[in-house]
C-alpha cells in the first residue's frame, strides 16, 4: 500500500483517519490560509485543501498527500476560525437558532493523479442564551474551529439538527474519502 501523508495538524482529522483504519503520517502544511476571490464556498475549501496538499506534495512526490479545509457559512458570510473570544461570541450569536452550512473540501494528490471534492452539511442550532455562549467561549474550545464550535465536543449541545455528513462537520468526510482513495489503489476495508 502506498504511504499517505495528512497535510494537517488537526487532531480531529488525525482521529478520523485513525478511526477508519487509514495508515498515514503527518506533515503539517505551512500554507497561509487566505481566501481570495472565489465564486463559491465549495471552490474556497477545495482550493485551500489543494494548496495545503500541494505544498506538502512538492517534497514528498512518492506519497499520496491529503489536504483538507473546512469553513462555515451563514447567509453568504464565511465564518472561519475566530481571531479572539469576542469574535467567537459574535459568530455563536449569529448562528443561534438558525441553520448554517459547513463545507469541507479535500484534495488527494499523487504523482499521477489529483482528486478534489467537497461535502456540504446543514447544521441547525437551538436558540442559545448569552450565558451558554459565554460559558462555551470561556472553555476555549471554539477558538480553533471554523464557525466557533466543535460538533464533536461541548458544542454538540447547541446542535438541534444536522442534514448531511456529520464527519464533514468535524473536519473530514471520512466515508467519502475512503471511497475516493480506492482510485489510488488504497482500500482500507480489507486492511
UniProtKB/Swiss-Prot annotation:
Q: Name one GO biological process term.
A: nucleotide metabolic process
Q: Which reaction does it catalyse?
A: dTTP + H2O = dTMP + diphosphate + H(+); UTP + H2O = UMP + diphosphate + H(+)
Cofactor(s) required, per the database record: a divalent metal cation
Q: Which GO terms describe its molecular function?
A: dTTP diphosphatase activity; UTP diphosphatase activity
Q: Which domain of life is it from?
A: Bacteria
User: Main EC class of this protein?
Assistant: hydrolase
Q: Does the record carry Cytoplasm as a key word?
A: yes
Q: Per the record, where is site Important for substrate specificity?
A: 12, 70, 152
What does the UniProt keyword field contain?
Cytoplasm, Hydrolase, Nucleotide metabolism
Membrane spanning residue stretches:
none
UniProt main location, coarse = cytoplasm
What Pfam families does its record include? Maf
UniProt GO cellular component terms = cytoplasm
Entry annotation: catalytic residues: 69
Q: Where in the cell is it found?
A: Cytoplasm
Q: What is its EC number?
A: 3.6.1.9
- Cytoplasm recorded as keyword: yes
Which SUPFAM superfamilies does the UniProt record give? ITPase-like (SSF52972)
Q: Which PANTHER family match?
A: BIFUNCTIONAL DTTP/UTP PYROPHOSPHATASE/METHYLTRANSFERASE PROTEIN-RELATED (PTHR43213), BIFUNCTIONAL DTTP_UTP PYROPHOSPHATASE_METHYLTRANSFERASE PROTEIN-RELATED (PTHR43213:SF5)
| Entry similarity comment | Belongs to the Maf family. YhdE subfamily.
Main function: Nucleoside triphosphate pyrophosphatase that hydrolyzes dTTP and UTP. May have a dual role in cell division arrest and in preventing the incorporation of modified nucleotides into cellular nucleic acids.
Q: What is this protein called?
A: dTTP/UTP pyrophosphatase
Amino acid at each position: 500500500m502506498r504511504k499517505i501523508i495528512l497535510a494537517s495538524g488537526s487532531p480531529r482529522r488525525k482521529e478520523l483517519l485513525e478511526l477508519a483504519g487509514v495508515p498515514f503520517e503527518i506533515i503539517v502544511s505551512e500554507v497561509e490560509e487566505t481566501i481570495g476571490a472565489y465564486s463559491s464556498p465549495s471552490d474556497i475549501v477545495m482550493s485551500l485543501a489543494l494548496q495545503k496538499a500541494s505544498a506538502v506534495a512538492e517534497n514528498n512526490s512518492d506519497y499520496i498527500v491529503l489536504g483538507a479545509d473546512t469553513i462555515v457559512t451563514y447567509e453568504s458570510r464565511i465564518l472561519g476560525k475566530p481571531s479572539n473570544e469576542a469574535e467567537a461570541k459574535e459568530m455563536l450569536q449569529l448562528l443561534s437558532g438558525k441553520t448554517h452550512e459547513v463545507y469541507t473540501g479535500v484534495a488527494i494528490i499523487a504523482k499521477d493523479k489529483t482528486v478534489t471534492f467537497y461535502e456540504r452539511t446543514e447544521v441547525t442550532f437551538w436558540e442559545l442564551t448569552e450565558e451558554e455562549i459565554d460559558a462555551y467561549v470561556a472553555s476555549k474550545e471554539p477558538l480553533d474551529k471554523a464557525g466557533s464550535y466543535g460538533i464533536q465536543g461541548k458544542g454538540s449541545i447547541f446542535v438541534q439538527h444536522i442534514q448531511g455528513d456529520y464527519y464533514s462537520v468535524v473536519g473530514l468526510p471520512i466515508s467519502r474519502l475512503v471511497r475516493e482513495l480506492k482510485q489510488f489503489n488504497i482500500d482500507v476495508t480489507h486492511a
